């Protein structure tokens, strides 16, 4: 028997959909800024080849990138702070933060299952182990982005913070690495949403999902095991 089940409260959905365009703008404007001093390489190759900049028309737009970055970074920070505060006030953090080291093992099992290398579907609550590890890591990455961003933005006034990351270049390297991490997360996240189907996507739009005895997408849940 199928029933409607509330999965995501309105506050969580708002934070999610506000963060999506903000993060996109921050990444995009960050690449516009990076163009002016593209120092990172993979061996002999630049991280972003010249054709990437010309194809996407993001070359010679340093001023635009800085203007966008310095405006939207405050909105990104405010949205992130409010989200973290909400998770603690509402108790949502209990479902998001890994409870023990076993969660990391279970997260690996989830990855193997998603790659069709493990037959047994993992037991999950509202979030599976891989989601708990990933979403907690994203929050930590957000904090890292803010700190390294401030270290780059005000290296003289916040010299102590800049030095914590090994100086200006160290802070910029960490900031850049975190940005690449966001891009990789976004790609995997979109693929996972597509594989999970409309029911999962709808729950993040309207808050409700269609549930049955075996749980969403046929995965066993803690509730169904109790029954």
Region roles according to the model:
Residues 1-227:
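Membrane-embedded alpha-helical bundles that constitute the cytochrome b-like, heme-associated redox core
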């Amino acid at each position: 028997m199928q029933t409607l089940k509330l999965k995501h409260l309105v506050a969580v959905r708002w934070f999610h959909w506000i963060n999506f365009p903000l993060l996109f703008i921050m990444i995009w404007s960050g690449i516009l800024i990076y163009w002016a001093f593209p120092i990172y390489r993979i061996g002999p190759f630049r991280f972003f080849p010249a054709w990437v900049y010309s194809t996407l028309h993001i070359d010679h737009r340093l001023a635009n990138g800085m203007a966008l970055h310095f405006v939207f970074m405050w909105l990104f920070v405010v949205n992130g702070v409010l989200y973290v505060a909400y998770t603690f006030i509402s108790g949502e953090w209990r479902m998001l933060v890994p409870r023990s080291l076993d969660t990391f093992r279970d997260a690996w099992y989830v990855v193997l299952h998603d790659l069709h290398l493990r037959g047994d579907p993992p037991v999950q609550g509202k979030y599976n182990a891989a989601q708990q590890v990933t979403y907690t890591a994203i929050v930590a990455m957000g904090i890292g982005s803010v700190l390294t961003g401030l270290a780059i933005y005000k290296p003289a006034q916040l010299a102590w913070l800049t030095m914590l990351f090994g100086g200006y270049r160290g802070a910029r390297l960490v900031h850049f690495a975190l940005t690449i991490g966001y891009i990789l997360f976004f790609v995997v996240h979109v693929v996972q949403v597509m594989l999970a189907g409309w029911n999962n996507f709808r729950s993040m739009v309207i808050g409700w999902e269609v549930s049955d005895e075996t749980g969403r997408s046929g995965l066993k849940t803690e509730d169904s095991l109790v029954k």
